[in-house]
């Protein structure tokens, strides 16, 4: 491709509305342009990287036995009402009516559509296992779209759906997709983790997220420094206390704590560490239920864990008025002792290892010291409620410690079980002629989001540093003086030789200053660059620059071509 005939509208200045590096660089590199909030045009350079990633995804999906198809973006409301998600999904679901007053939505995902197709077409156990996938445009009406392709409203996604005769077979399909995802992100040259995750609005029994590690990542994840355990912080398990404390239980005492409403204030006032305190938090459901959660004062409540253990769809912090009505206690002095009848208390597992703790006395300006579980207060149930922290012991191995990372979610796989097949009546006849419900899995990858995440992980002050498998071009050939016929002839010859060997080359034949060409080539992130100038040619040399390392090589034109071809082929071979 000749640069002068291509369309790469680079920008020198960083757009003021671009908050994260990938958004800034994709705009500056001429890869995308905003059409409306969260909706983007993919310009030629950006589309090349998108197509590169799609090709890797297709190869691995096909290798894993998945079958490509394409479903409509527009979906009828009836299917979503059958699954129960029409009212549950919320305002992210873009709904509209056609001229006949029929209700529809723009698909944010396709569980209902694919299950509807399967219930019509698959009737026998002999037709399974089967796995369908598509690469499709989705739409989710995000309340605050931002970060470019990282959190847009319209986006490209690969989604796959597996159908099996039973749970064991579904586990096998899940493992096939898990391994396919591992290969996909390994082939892209990305530093990533596969982590245990919450199933969220999709539902199902278990799931894994695939996280590209980046300091700018919105998600907090943990991994063990000794074993392979890794999880999103929403899902990460804390290791239970070894057992009840052996510390001697002291006499319970009520003490004044005037205007000390926070854990930090109470601990400081009493001259104790915050890990000697217990905090109480009250939450409510959308149906008016309430619960008190208690945990160590230095720990943070994980609301996802609380919601899941209660089986509630949503939870929210109770208002001061709700807390007073439910517990009879003023805010700031809540505790698990002396509560009104009917108050449900859920305790974190770590409390089993505490003794002589400080708790709220359910009375203004008063706390108890030396409160002990079992003797002074009880809990209706004990569950893992807290967020894990860096340095916590690993829940899966002995001696391992948890490390904290920031990550960008680029893929998610779910064991759905019978959630959708049961709701939509997707059944089959087994070998005995009996009707059974189909077991499902679903598997998503954000296409544009992965390209953006690759940029978040791979960039410097000069621009993008694309991993070679995702780069729009493998190599650029830069002619320094386009008016020098010898330079142009040598550069053109190298360009055509590389193309003939399957190398994707951008020939920078523009009549621009060398500095402009170098800046643009660095900005758009092409991994390899050959610089052809009159001075070098007079010595029989050209310059090869490796973008990621900054290494420069002075080689003959023949050596340069051989080096580029070898590096590209090595990268492609290792990725496969």
Swiss-Prot record:
Pfam families assigned to the protein according to its UniProt record, in alphabetical order: HGTP_anticodon, tRNA-synt_2b, tRNA_edit
GO MF term (any one): ATP binding
The protein's Enzyme Commission number: 6.1.1.15
Location of the protein in the cell: Cytoplasm
GO BP term (any one): prolyl-tRNA aminoacylation
Main location: cytoplasm
CC per GO annotation: cytosol
UniProt keywords, alphabetically: Aminoacyl-tRNA synthetase, ATP-binding, Cytoplasm, Ligase, Nucleotide-binding, Protein biosynthesis
Catalytic activity: tRNA(Pro) + L-proline + ATP = L-prolyl-tRNA(Pro) + AMP + diphosphate
Keyword ATP-binding: yes
Enzyme class: ligase
Quaternary structure and interacting proteins, as annotated: Homodimer.
Family note: Belongs to the class-II aminoacyl-tRNA synthetase family. ProS type 1 subfamily.
Its job: Catalyzes the attachment of proline to tRNA(Pro) in a two-step reaction: proline is first activated by ATP to form Pro-AMP and then transferred to the acceptor end of tRNA(Pro). As ProRS can inadvertently accommodate and process non-cognate amino acids such as alanine and cysteine, to avoid such errors it has two additional distinct editing activities against alanine. One activity is designated as 'pretransfer' editing and involves the tRNA(Pro)-independent hydrolysis of activated Ala-AMP.
Domain notes: Consists of three domains: the N-terminal catalytic domain, the editing domain and the C-terminal anticodon-binding domain.
PANTHER family given in the database record: MITOCHONDRIAL RIBOSOME PROTEIN L39/PROLYL-TRNA LIGASE FAMILY MEMBER, PROLINE--TRNA LIGASE
The protein's name in its UniProt record: Proline--tRNA ligase
Origin species: Pelobacter propionicus (strain DSM 2379 / NBRC 103807 / OttBd1)
């Amino acid at each position: 491709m000749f640069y002068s005939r291509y369309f790469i509208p680079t920008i020198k200045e960083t757009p003021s509305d671009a908050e994260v590096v990938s958004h800034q660089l994709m705009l500056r590199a001429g890869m995308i342009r905003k059409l409306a909030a969260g909706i983007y045009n993919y310009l030629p350079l950006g589309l090349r990287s998108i197509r590169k990633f799609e090709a890797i995804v297709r190869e691995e999906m096909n290798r894993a036995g998945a079958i490509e198809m394409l479903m409509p973006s527009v979906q009828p409301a009836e299917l979503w009402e059958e699954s129960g998600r029409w009212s549950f999904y919320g305002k992210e679901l873009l709904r509209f009516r056609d001229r006949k007053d029929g209700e529809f939505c723009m698909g944010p995902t396709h569980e209902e559509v694919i299950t509807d197709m399967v219930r019509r077409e698959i009737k026998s156990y002999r037709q399974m296992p089967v796995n369908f996938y598509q690469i499709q445009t989705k739409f989710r009406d995000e309340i605050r779209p931002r970060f470019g392709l990282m959190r847009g409203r319209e986006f490209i996604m690969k989604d796959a759906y597996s159908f099996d005769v039973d749970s064991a077979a579904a586990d096998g399909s899940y493992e096939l997709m898990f391994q396919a995802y591992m290969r996909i992100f390994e082939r892209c040259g990305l530093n990533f983790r596969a982590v245990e995750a919450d199933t969220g609005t999709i539902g199902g029994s278990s799931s894994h997220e695939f996280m590209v590690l980046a300091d700018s990542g919105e998600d907090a994840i943990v991994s063990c420094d000794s074993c392979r355990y890794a999880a999103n912080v929403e899902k990460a398990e804390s290791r239970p206390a070894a057992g009840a404390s052996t510390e001697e239980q002291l006499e319970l005492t009520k003490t004044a704590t005037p205007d000390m409403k926070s854990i930090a204030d109470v601990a400081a006032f009493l001259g104790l560490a915050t890990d000697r305190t217990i905090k109480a938090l009250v939450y409510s459901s959308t149906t008016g239920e309430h619960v008190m959660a208690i945990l160590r004062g230095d720990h943070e409540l994980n609301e996802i864990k609380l919601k899941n253990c209660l089986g509630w769809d949503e939870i929210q912090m109770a208002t001061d008025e709700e807390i007073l009505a439910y517990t009879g206690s003023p805010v700031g002095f809540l505790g698990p002792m002396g509560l009104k009848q009917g108050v449900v208390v859920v305790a974190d597992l770590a409390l089993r290892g505490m003794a002589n703790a400080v708790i709220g006395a359910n009375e203004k300006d008063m706390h108890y010291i030396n409160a002990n579980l079992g003797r002074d207060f009880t809990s209706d149930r004990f569950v893992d409620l807290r967020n894990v922290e860096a340095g916590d012991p690993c829940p899966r191995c002995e001696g391992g410690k948890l490390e904290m990372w920031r990550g960008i979610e680029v893929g998610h796989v779910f064991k759905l079980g019978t959630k959708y097949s049961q709701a939509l009546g997707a059944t089959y006849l087994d070998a005995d002629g009996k009707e059974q419900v189909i077991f499902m899995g679903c598997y998503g990858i954000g296409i544009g989001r992965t390209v953006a995440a690759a940029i978040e992980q791979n960039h410097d002050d000069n621009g993008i540093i694309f991993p070679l498998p995702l780069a729009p071009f493998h190599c650029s050939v830069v002619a320094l003086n386009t008016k020098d016929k010898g330079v142009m002839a040598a550069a053109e010859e190298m360009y055509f030789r590389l193309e003939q060997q399957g190398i994707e080359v951008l020939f920078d034949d523009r009549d621009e200053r060398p500095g402009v060409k170098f800046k643009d080539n660095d900005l758009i992130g092409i991994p390899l660059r050959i610089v052809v100038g009159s001075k070098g040619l007079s010595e029989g040399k050209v310059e090869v620059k490796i973008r990621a390392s900054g290494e420069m090589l002075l080689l003959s034109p023949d050596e340069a071509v051989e080096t580029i071809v070898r590096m590209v082929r090595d990268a492609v071979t290792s990725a496969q």
